[in-house]
Amino acid sequence: MTIPISLAKLNSSADTHSALEVFNLQKVASSARRGKFGIAERIAALNLLKETIQRREPEIIAALAADFRKPASEVKLTEIFPVLQEINHAKRNLKDWMKPRRVRAALSVAGTRAGLRYEPKGVCLIIAPWNYPFNLSFGPLVSALAAGNSVVIKPSELTPHTATLIGSIVREAFSVDLVAVVEGDAAVSQELLALPFDHIFFTGSPRVGKLVMEAASKTLASVTLELGGKSPTIIGPTANLPKAARNIVWGKFSNNGQTCIAPDHVFVHRCIAQKFNEILVKEIVRVYGKDFAAQRRSADYCRIVNDQHFNRINKLLTDAKAKGAKILQGGQVDATERLVVPTVLSNVTAAMDINHEEIFGPLLPIIEYDDIDSVIKRVNDGDKPLALYVFSEDKQFVNNIVARTSSGSVGVNLSVVHFLHPNLPFGGVNNSGIGSAHGVYGFRAFSHEKPVLIDKFSITHWLFPPYTKKVKQLIGITVKYLS
């Protein structure tokens, strides 16, 4: 394959450049590239990324195993596959996404032709999290490249093996003036956020998201914030309980619960609670093993990313047990391995910290209810979650919940897998996020939608000053009949 000259690999590394040097280099290159980085160049860039990822898949699996023992199959399904799917989807649809759009004519400007054009925002910053460090670095990169931007990626320092590999992959595929990786801790993020990027894409906690938005306000950079929250699951009386249990176990305990759209807690109708709990525990045993020793040995179970997060999760568990929570499954931990086994708790009360903080770990509170209105009120009294899940065979029950709650997305009789749908926007509401990612929505997030109005035979100049008697009459007619 012949690579366009703009994508020829340079014998240089972002490691040898400061954040400011990388930004300035990309700013100059982005200006020079404007209007010239068309569909052929963008698809070539996406092909390079895809080929490099596929060739280095074993290294990706090894890096994530080294960082927090993520299982190989989970890496393929939740880290690599979504990025490759995003690339393929962008390649298939990019011509249509980039195409100028005609806009309906308006009588007030009769004689003109209106349209929309999508231009790159310019130099963009992607700040990636640690929980899905590969997916959430390269997924947004696909959208940014499809839109024609230059990009700086700041991977999380909490997954150092993966961060180093991300830098290596980027340097193999791209020149620094198109895509660069800048590694470092929070101080490096602050240094980057002080620069006047044209768009910032951040994935992380609401607390840090507010800091990112505050920094962006100083340069008036646009932002996409993919945050989090306590995503509730509601199980109705007519739910298929085995199906609900399978989905919840996979959605909650994959990645050891360290997923922004994982079910945070479960509301289950009291009339089916005991039966559901029994099925749920059996499903955990089937997937991960019957006891602590088996779950520790499981090749399909990840670890907590670091000691700080392990201690936070263990503190939530200890607090809940001390205040009367009942352990239905699990409850054991091993600090030496940063291991918290799949844990299900009942008798969870408002006095417990687990009821208020985003868990972001393998603790699953089960909360019984009698009246769905009380559940809806509780959901609406809190911050708007990134996701909400409903398990029910009753369409009226489902539609009532969907209509009366607000969340970034809703999954009905499934959990988490909506992230994989390339034609759906992915994003939150207020505290759980701003803006959308994936597919055309990601493309538009990294694009400026530019309106263009062209005069063909417009008569609007008849309304220009000086405001003679005739012009005033025309203005009066315009206001009267076109308002």
Swiss-Prot record:
Arranged from A to Z, the UniProt key words for this protein are: NAD, Oxidoreductase, Plasmid
Provide the residue positions that the database annotates as binding NAD(+): G204, S205, P206, R207, V208, G209
- Database matches in Pfam families: Aldedh (PF00171)
The protein's induction, as recorded, is:
Induced by AlkS.
Q: In which pathway is this protein known to take part?
A: Hydrocarbon metabolism; alkane degradation
One GO cellular component term? cytoplasm
Q: Which GO terms describe its biological process?
A: aldehyde metabolic process; alkane catabolic process
Catalytic residues, per the record, are E226, C260
Reaction(s) catalysed (UniProt annotation)? an aldehyde + NAD(+) + H2O = a carboxylate + NADH + 2 H(+)
Q: Which family does it belong to?
A: Belongs to the aldehyde dehydrogenase family.
**Protein's name according to its UniProt entry:** Aldehyde dehydrogenase
The protein's organism comes out as Ectopseudomonas oleovorans
Taxonomic lineage per UniProt?
Answer: Bacteria, Pseudomonadati, Pseudomonadota, Gammaproteobacteria, Pseudomonadales
